[in-house]
C-alpha cells in the first residue's frame, strides 16, 4: 500500500524543521497524518477567464478540510491570448504552457503534496495543468472557471449574439463605422469567464470531462451561474475520497494515468472532432499524452477524424450557438451520449466520479436520464448582466434543447456533417501532418488550389493582406512561426480576421507552421510539420508555387518537382533555415524554449533526447 507522499515532511524527528514550518501555515497537531492536497489556482486580474477565481481556491480548500484533508493553495501564471495577440506578447503564450506545467511540478514535488485540485480556465492553463497532472500521476480533479456569457446587442432592429471574434472582425473592417465597432466592442465580452464560443479554453475544459478528470458540466456551465459553485464544492469533497482510495485502499484506478488512459484520450479526441473544437486541442492532447507515456499520436487523430461525425456546431463556426447553448442541450455528456449510441465511444473507461462512462451517461445524458435535478442543472442559462462575479445569477431556460435533429447537438443520423469537425492533412508540404478545423470551412472550399503568397512572419502577412498583396484564389503561407522558429508558435488570428474584413475569408486559403486561435474559421491550415525552422518543406515554398488542398482526401501538396525542391533544400541548409530579413526581438527565456521545442506533430513539447545523458 502506498504511503502518503507528505509523510516525508510530516513524520520523523528529523523533520522537526519541516513540521515547524507547516505549523506556521496553520497545520495543527491533529492534522499531521492527513493527506496534503494542493489547490492549484490560476487567479489573475489580467484575464477575464480567471478574474473571478480569487475566492475559488479557498472554497475548494474549505471542503477539503471538512472532508479530512489539509488544503494548501498556490497560483500559476495565466496568459490571456486575446490581449497578447497582435504583438510580441503572443510569442509567450504557448511557452507559458510548459512554464505552468513545470511550476505545478515544482510546487507539488518540493512540498510532497499527495493530490491536487486544478482550478484552470483559459487557453494554456488547462493544458499546462493537465500535462503536470499526468507527469506527476497523483490523484487530481479539474474544475474550471467556466465560460463567459455570449454578448448581445441590437443592430438594424435585430438582436445579435456576439463574442470576442466579432469585435476583432468589426474593428478591422474599414466599412464598419466607428460607432458600430464600438458598440460591438462594448457588448462582445459581457462577463467573467472564458470566451463564449468553442474556442481553445472551452474546448479544453470540455475535453477534461471526456478524459474523466472533471465533473459533468465543467466545460459548459456558465461562470456566472450559481449552480457552478457546486462543482467547486464537490471537487473539494471528491478529491479527498479519490486520495484515500489510492493511498489507503491501494486503488490505483484513482490515478490520472489510469483514468486518462489511451481509450480516454480517444474519447476526448472523438468529442473534439464531434464538437468542432479548436485546433489547439490537438497540440495539447498530444503534449499531455507524451507526459503520461500514453501511445497517442497524429496517426490516431487521423484515423478518428475519418470516423467521427460533426455533431455540435458552435461559434466561431456559426453565430447561432455559444457555450450557453451547448449547456442547454446537455453539455459534453449529451455529445458523448450520441457518440455512444453510434458505437463511437469507449464507455468502459472510468472517471473521477468512480463510475464507468456507461454509468455516468445513464445519469447525466439528458436524452436518457430520469433525474429532474440533472435536467434542471442543464437548464442553467445566462442573465445578460455585465459582471465579473462568479455565481452571481440563477437564471434558467424554460426548456432544454433536446432536439437531436435540428438543435445545437445532433445525433449521428442528423449530424451537421458525417465528416468530423477536425481533420489531419498530409503531403509533401506537411510530411508529418497538419491540422484544419473543417467545422469552420465553407463547403465550397474543401478542395482548393492556388498560387502561394509567402510571408516570413505574421507581422509581414498582416501588412501584406492589408496592403493588397493577397487576392482571391491565393494561398497565404506564413512560415517560421512554429514552436522553434517563432519561437513560441504564435496564433494567426489577425491574418485570418483581416482576410475576412476585406472580403477574402472564403476566397483564400492560409497555411502556417504556426497555430490558430480557437476563434479562427475559414480554410486555415496550421501546425504544418516539420516546421520551417526544423527543415520542413514549408520553408522551401516560393511565391507563385501552386498548392493543392483536398480535405476530403486529406491531402496537401506543393506542386514543385523533386529536383527543384532538392536544390532549394540545399540552399536552405546553407542558410541555416532562418527567415529572410525578419527583425524580431527574442528574449533569452524564449530562446531557451526554442532550443528544446519540437514541431507541432509532437505537441510542441520539449525534445527530451536533448536532456538525457
Swiss-Prot record:
As cofactor, the record names: [2Fe-2S] cluster; Mg(2+)
The residues listed in the UniProt record as binding [2Fe-2S] cluster, with positions renumbered to this chain, are 122, 195
Please give one Pfam family short name: ILVD_EDD_N
Q: Where is the active site?
A: 517 (proton acceptor)
Positions with a binding annotation for Mg(2+): 81, 123-124, 491
Gene Ontology terms, MF aspect: 2 iron, 2 sulfur cluster binding; dihydroxy-acid dehydratase activity; magnesium ion binding
Catalysed reactions listed for this entry: (2R)-2,3-dihydroxy-3-methylbutanoate = 3-methyl-2-oxobutanoate + H2O; (2R,3R)-2,3-dihydroxy-3-methylpentanoate = (S)-3-methyl-2-oxopentanoate + H2O
Q: N6-carboxylysine is carried by which residues?
A: 124
Q: Tell me which GO cellular component terms the UniProt record holds.
A: cytosol
Cofactor-binding details, from the entry: Binds 1 [2Fe-2S] cluster per subunit. This cluster acts as a Lewis acid cofactor.
Q: So what EC number does this one have? A: 4.2.1.9
Q: Which UniProt keywords apply?
A: 2Fe-2S, Amino-acid biosynthesis, Branched-chain amino acid biosynthesis, Iron, Iron-sulfur, Lyase, Magnesium, Metal-binding
Q: Which pathway does UniProt place it in?
A: Amino-acid biosynthesis; L-isoleucine biosynthesis; L-isoleucine from 2-oxobutanoate: step 3/4; Amino-acid biosynthesis; L-valine biosynthesis; L-valine from pyruvate: step 3/4
Q: Which GO terms describe its biological process?
A: isoleucine biosynthetic process; L-valine biosynthetic process
Question: What InterPro entries does its record include?
Answer: Dihydro-acid_dehy_C, DihydroxyA_deHydtase, DiOHA_6PGluconate_deHydtase_CS, ILV_EDD_C, ILV_EDD_N, IlvD/EDD_N
Q: Which SUPFAM superfamilies match?
A: IlvD/EDD N-terminal domain-like, LeuD/IlvD-like
Q: Do you know which HAMAP family this protein is assigned to?
A: IlvD
**Its function?**
Functions in the biosynthesis of branched-chain amino acids. Catalyzes the dehydration of (2R,3R)-2,3-dihydroxy-3-methylpentanoate (2,3-dihydroxy-3-methylvalerate) into 2-oxo-3-methylpentanoate (2-oxo-3-methylvalerate) and of (2R)-2,3-dihydroxy-3-methylbutanoate (2,3-dihydroxyisovalerate) into 2-oxo-3-methylbutanoate (2-oxoisovalerate), the penultimate precursor to L-isoleucine and L-valine, respectively.
| Family under the similarity heading | Belongs to the IlvD/Edd family.
Q: How does it assemble?
A: Homodimer.
* Protein's name in the database: Dihydroxy-acid dehydratase
Origin organism lineage? Bacteria, Pseudomonadati, Pseudomonadota, Gammaproteobacteria, Vibrionales
Amino acid at each position: 500500500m502506498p504511503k502518503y507522499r507528505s509523510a516525508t515532511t510530516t513524520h520523523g524527528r528529523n523533520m522537526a524543521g519541516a513540521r515547524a514550518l507547516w505549523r506556521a501555515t496553520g497545520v495543527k497537531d491533529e492534522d499531521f497524518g492527513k493527506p496534503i492536497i494542493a489547490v492549484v489556482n490560476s487567479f489573475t486580474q489580467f484575464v477575464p477567464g480567471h478574474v473571478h477565481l480569487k475566492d475559488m481556491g479557498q472554497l475548494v480548500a474549505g471542503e477539503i478540510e471538512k472532508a479530512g484533508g489539509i488544503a494548501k493553495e498556490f497560483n500559476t501564471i495565466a496568459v490571456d491570448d486575446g490581449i497578447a495577440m497582435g504583438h510580441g506578447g503572443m510569442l509567450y503564450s504557448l511557452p507559458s504552457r510548459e512554464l505552468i506545467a513545470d511550476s505545478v511540478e515544482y510546487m507539488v514535488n518540493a512540498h510532497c503534496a499527495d493530490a491536487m485540485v486544478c482550478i484552470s480556465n483559459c487557453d494554456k492553463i488547462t493544458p499546462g495543468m493537465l500535462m503536470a497532472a499526468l507527469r506527476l500521476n497523483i490523484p487530481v480533479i479539474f474544475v474550471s472557471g467556466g465560460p463567459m456569457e455570449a454578448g448581445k446587442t441590437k443592430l438594424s432592429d435585430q438582436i445579435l449574439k456576439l463574442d470576442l471574434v466579432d469585435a476583432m472582425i468589426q474593428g478591422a473592417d474599414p466599412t464598419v463605422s466607428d460607432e458600430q465597432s464600438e458598440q460591438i466592442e462594448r457588448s462582445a465580452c459581457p462577463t467573467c469567464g472564458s470566451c463564449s464560443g468553442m474556442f481553445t479554453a472551452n474546448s479544453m475544459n470540455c475535453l477534461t470531462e471526456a478524459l474523466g478528470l472533471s465533473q459533468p458540466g465543467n466545460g459548459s456551465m456558465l461562470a456566472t451561474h450559481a449552480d457552478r459553485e457546486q462543482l467547486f464544492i464537490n471537487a473539494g469533497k471528491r478529491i479527498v475520497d479519490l486520495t484515500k482510495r489510492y493511498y489507503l485502499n491501494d486503488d490505483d484506478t484513482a490515478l490520472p494515468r489510469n483514468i486518462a488512459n489511451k481509450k480516454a484520450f480517444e474519447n476526448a479526441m472523438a468529442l473534439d472532432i464531434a464538437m468542432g473544437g479548436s485546433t489547439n486541442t490537438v497540440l495539447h492532447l498530444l503534449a499531455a499524452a507524451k507526459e503520461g507515456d500514453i501511445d497517442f499520436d497524429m496517426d490516431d487523430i487521423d484515423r478518428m477524424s475519418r470516423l467521427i461525425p460533426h455533431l455540435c456546431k458552435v461559434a466561431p463556426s456559426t453565430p447561432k450557438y455559444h457555450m450557453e447553448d451547448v449547456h442547454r442541450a446537455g453539455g459534453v455528456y449529451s455529445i458523448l451520449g450520441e457518440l455512444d449510441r453510434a458505437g463511437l465511444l469507449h464507455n468502459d473507461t472510468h472517471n473521477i466520479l468512480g463510475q464507468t462512462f456507461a454509468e455516468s451517461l445513464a445519469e447525466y445524458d439528458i436524452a436518457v436520464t430520469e433525474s429532474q435535478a440533472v435536467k434542471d442543472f442543464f437548464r442553467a442559462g445566462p442573465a445578460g448582466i455585465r459582471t465579473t462575479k462568479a455565481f452571481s445569477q440563477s437564471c434558467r431556460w424554460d426548456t432544454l434543447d433536446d432536439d437531436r435533429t435540428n438543435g445545437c447537438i445532433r445525433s449521428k443520423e442528423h449530424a451537421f456533417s458525417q465528416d468530423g469537425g477536425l481533420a489531419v492533412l498530409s503531403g509533401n508540404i506537411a510530411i508529418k501532418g497538419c491540422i484544419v478545423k473543417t467545422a469552420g470551412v465553407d463547403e465550397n472550399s474543401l478542395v482548393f488550389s492556388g498560387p502561394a503568397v509567402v510571408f516570413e512572419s505574421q507581422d509581414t502577412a498582416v501588412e501584406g493582406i492589408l496592403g493588397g498583396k493577397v487576392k482571391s484564389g491565393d494561398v497565404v503561407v506564413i512560415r517560421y512561426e512554429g514552436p522553434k522558429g517563432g519561437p513560441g508558435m504564435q496564433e494567426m488570428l489577425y491574418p485570418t480576421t483581416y482576410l475576412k474584413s476585406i472580403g477574402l475569408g472564403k476566397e483564400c486559403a492560409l497555411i502556417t507552421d504556426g497555430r490558430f486561435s480557437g476563434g479562427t474559421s475559414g480554410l486555415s491550415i496550421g501546425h504544418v510539420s516539420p516546421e520551417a525552422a526544423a527543415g520542413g518543406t514549408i520553408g522551401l515554398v516560393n511565391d507563385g508555387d501552386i498548392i493543392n488542398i483536398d480535405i476530403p482526401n486529406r491531402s496537401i501538396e506543393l506542386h514543385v518537382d523533386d529536383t527543384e525542391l532538392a536544390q532549394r533544400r540545399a540552399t536552405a541548409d546553407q542558410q541555416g533555415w532562418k527567415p529572410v530579413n525578419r527583425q524580431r526581438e527574442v528574449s533569452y527565456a524564449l530562446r531557451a524554449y526554442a532550443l528544446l521545442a519540437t514541431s507541432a506533430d509532437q505537441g510542441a513539447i520539449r525534445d527530451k533526447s536533448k536532456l538525457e545523458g
